[in-house]
Amino acid sequence: LKPLHIFIHGGYWRALDKDYHAHMSVPFNKNNILFFNINYDLCPKVTLSDICNQTIEAIIWIFNNCKNYGGNNKKISISGHSAGAHLVSYLLNIDWSMYDLPKNVFQGAALISGIYNLKIVQKISVNKELNLSNKEVQEKTTLNKLPTFKIPLFISYGENEPEGWKHQSISYCDFLTKNDYKYKVIPSKGDNHFTLIDTLANENSNICKEIIKLSK
């Protein structure tokens, strides 16, 4: 059975689709790693809470069905970009034993230019579509929540991103450091928030190499 990697796309929870990121499967396939590229409904059709629940359902389905595709559910890694990185950080906070899954369902995770403090999102224009409630902001902000299990964790952001985007990742790293949670951070030289996607799909990039390493 092959190890498998799960990717969650970004788009501020309100845009894009897994098909925009299908090219990311190439380096994983070359390394004999199954690639699961998951989708979710978008705001304002659904709430952020709905999206979080959908990603939980996706993980449960993949865990229970990956063997049908030749996958090893004991070797699951996961990554996400932007809003997708937020969703991955949220999934790291779940007690998976509540769903009859191993508590440490992931063997490694990569957070690429994520959004971890939703209080900021609540104050900007995209919130017209997200319509985040105060309860959602409190429950779904991951900046102050430690992962429920310790795994290799890789955090990256683009060197040329706006300071606000960088600050999200740096603040999350600071929180992990204060709580003695080990991680590895690699800024991606020359990248902005959007070119990071192509870098993720480039098997010669540091980010892609690190994620492949997490996945084996």
Annotate the PLM regions:
Residues 1-216:
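Alpha/beta-hydrolase superfamily serine-hydrolase fold, recognizing
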